[in-house]
Amino acid sequence: MNILLLLMLLTSIILLVILIFLAYNEIMEKPTSSCITPAPESQSISPDQTTQLQTTTPVTSTPSNPTPTTIIPNLPPTLNPLSEIVSNGDNVLQQQQSLINGDFAASIQLDGNLCISNTKNQSVLWCSNSAELGQAPYFLLLRSDGNMCIQDSHNNPTWCSGVIGGQSPWKATLQSDGDLCINDYLGQELWCATRKLPN
């Protein structure tokens, strides 16, 4: 009986040490406040809450050149940064989060604008021009039909890529050239942020 109690105590101590180790690693991996280098007339970024997702009717808008509210974050280094989101609903890009590939980052700003920037030379390549539409916080997801949308806190779409078609599942990838593209399961490129694709 004493051996059984001793084994239970030893197991409890080991579990406690593991939990403390995991909690310490989680705290150490969370970035502290990052420095923001704003473009003219920009706003600073602060952490926001996440939101639960629901399917809504898509809104389509045509993206154009970056807006004056564009900010370029100096992103803290991460061990395994995301460079893509997939249509299975597991990956959602929240405000303060970025897709990263080399010197390029695609980020959701506090005003609801999705922007692609070159973090090395602090330039903006493309923005969705969806600033101040809907109500913060905003998030980006790739829906189950292949349409990539920014949604507000009420799950209303404020901007969508307009892509519907191809083979499921879809993948939105920030490429090494800084373009954000949607491909279907077969690898067919259906939409890209900064270049026109043939119909």
UniProtKB/Swiss-Prot annotation:
One of its GO terms (molecular function) is carbohydrate binding. GO terms for cellular component: extracellular region. The keyword Secreted applies. Disulfide bonds: none annotated. Residues 35-74 are annotated as: Disordered. InterPro entries: Bulb-type_lectin_dom, Bulb-type_lectin_dom_sf. It is found in: Secreted. Gene3D superfamilies: Bulb-type lectin domain (2.90.10.10). Residues 49-73 have a biased composition (Low complexity). Glycans are attached at residue 121. Residues 84-195 form the Bulb-type lectin domain. Residues 1-25 form the signal peptide. This is Putative lectin L633. It comes from Acanthamoeba polyphaga mimivirus.
